[in-house]
Design a protein with these regions (language model features):
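A fold-level detector for beta-propeller and closely related beta-sheet-rich head/sensor domains
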Residues: 1-145
Length: 145
């Protein structure tokens, strides 16, 4: 979403959602689920943050990562969260606040010593936010039961 889609006050000129996460069945080509992703918590008109986690679905600016265990991780919205979704339903099942926004796709690795799987995200700042940083954050996935 560039300025051509915004009013002079910086407000989008179309109705929400402005960004969604979608799952498509690759065999049938049918949409399985679609959910708005992102809030206006860290954005607002005239560059003033709203500080309200209203889930309107914000423009998405990064890649997602799905795991074999049925989790989909995504951080590329204009608020400062890494989210995990259930790949079967699209339900947001976890989120954590990042120090600044991220337009990075999450990465994963498994420790060769412990066998534990980690999700890593780079957070350097989100478009339309003056906040910048230089963070690499790792989260450990729960052990398999």
């Amino acid at each position: 979403m560039r300025e051509r889609f915004l009013s002079p006050l910086g407000i989008p000129c179309q109705k929400p959602p402005f960004g969604t996460m979608s799952a498509v069945d690759l065999k049938s080509g049918k949409l399985v689920w679609q959910v708005p992703v992102g809030t206006v918590e860290d954005t607002g008109p005239l560059g003033i943050r709203m500080h309200m986690p209203i889930p309107v679905g914000m423009p998405t600016l990064g890649a997602s990562l799905s795991t074999q265990s049925g989790l989909l991780f995504f951080a590329g919205t204009q608020d400062f969260y890494l989210r995990a979704f259930d790949t079967a339903t699209g339900k947001e099942i976890w989120k954590d606040r990042l120090p600044v926004g991220s337009q990075s796709g999450p990465m994963t690795y498994v420790s060769p010593k412990t066998g534990k799987q980690y999700i890593i995200i780079n957070a350097g700042g989100a478009r339309q936010s003056p906040d910048r940083g230089d963070y690499v954050i790792a989260y450990a996935l729960p052990d398999k039961k």
